[in-house]
Amino acid sequence: MNTENKEITSNWFTNLRDLLCKEFEKIEEKYAQIKGLKPAKFVRTSWKRNGGGCGIMSLMKGEVFEKVGVNISTVFGEFSQEFRSEILGAELDGKFFATGISVVAHLKSPLIPAMHFNTRYIETSKNWFGGGSDLTPFYPEENETAKFHTAFKEACDKYDSSYYPKFKRQCDEYFYLRHRKEPRGVGGIFYDYLNSGNFEQDFAFTRDIGKALLSVYPEIVRSKLFLPWTDEQKEYQLIKRGRYVEFNLLYDRGTKFGLMTDGNIEAILMSLPPVVKFN
């Protein structure tokens, strides 16, 4: 396993965490200033993994972001025998290293889309990058969806013109609730097992995916910051959030990986919405 690669990837995810938290806090500050409220701030909680590694969960519950979490973690050790066959390159000795960032935002306003993002670097006897981002609006708008997709398409096209259509298709296939036969949202990109043979290029691509999120999602939130909504719209949001819960508990790879590696339960389940209704 490459020590330098582990260090620089972990450092980037920490840096991206700081940039995102700062941007989200600025949005809360702006809203609080106009409304005469005290702005919410992120609360950070550190955790350690018994088998090796640690993480930091940053959580903010405010007036704009009903719940937004930004998790970073770096964990290592050995998979148990029962899981080794499920992870690429872990079949022989089960050793692994994983570092990454995971972001999930649930907004109070039903007019502002929920967002999920994660990028990660994993080493076993193999090594690869993975990640992506998707948008879940409760009241989809074509222009907003196009803006979100364009940001990630531009990041992809810098490296390979085949990336965006491939990763968009993978996102559509991945974020699909098979038991309901419906998509979770309006998509985005999703990639896994990315190893072109050029670590520097793959790492640069993963950094640019993070920068794409930073450029587009805060802008979407700000554009709808002061739009009024109705009780009926809020009720619909709470019901649709149930789909989010179903996906994360039934299909999400990150949730499964966290449980397989004995990760922090609060951090693993951070992605769940704060309030949900099931009808």
From Swiss-Prot:
Pathway the protein acts in: Porphyrin-containing compound metabolism; protoporphyrin-IX biosynthesis; protoporphyrinogen-IX from coproporphyrinogen-III (O2 route): step 1/1
Cofactor(s) needed: a divalent metal cation
Biological processes per GO annotation: protoporphyrinogen IX biosynthetic process
Location in or out of the cell: Cytoplasm
Binding, a divalent metal cation: H106, H116, H149, H179
Leader sequence residues: none
Region (Important for dimerization): 244-279
One GO CC term on file: cytoplasm
Site features described as Important for dimerization, chain residue numbers: H179
Reactions listed under catalytic activity: coproporphyrinogen III + O2 + 2 H(+) = protoporphyrinogen IX + 2 CO2 + 2 H2O
Active site: H116 (proton donor)
Classification via Pfam families: Coprogen_oxidas
GO molecular function: coproporphyrinogen oxidase activity; metal ion binding; protein homodimerization activity
Entry-linked PROSITE patterns: COPROGEN_OXIDASE
Keyword annotations of the record: Cytoplasm, Heme biosynthesis, Metal-binding, Oxidoreductase, Porphyrin biosynthesis
Known EC number: 1.3.3.3
Residues where substrate binds: S102, N118, T119, R120
Oligomeric form and interacting partners: Homodimer.
Family to which this protein belongs: Belongs to the aerobic coproporphyrinogen-III oxidase family.
PANTHER family from the UniProt entry: COPROPORPHYRINOGEN III OXIDASE, MITOCHONDRIAL, OXYGEN-DEPENDENT COPROPORPHYRINOGEN-III OXIDASE, MITOCHONDRIAL
Function statement: Involved in the heme biosynthesis. Catalyzes the aerobic oxidative decarboxylation of propionate groups of rings A and B of coproporphyrinogen-III to yield the vinyl groups in protoporphyrinogen-IX.
HAMAP family, per the entry: Coprogen_oxidas (MF_00333)
Protein name per Swiss-Prot or TrEMBL: Oxygen-dependent coproporphyrinogen-III oxidase
Organism, as annotated: Rickettsia typhi (strain ATCC VR-144 / Wilmington)
Gene: hemF
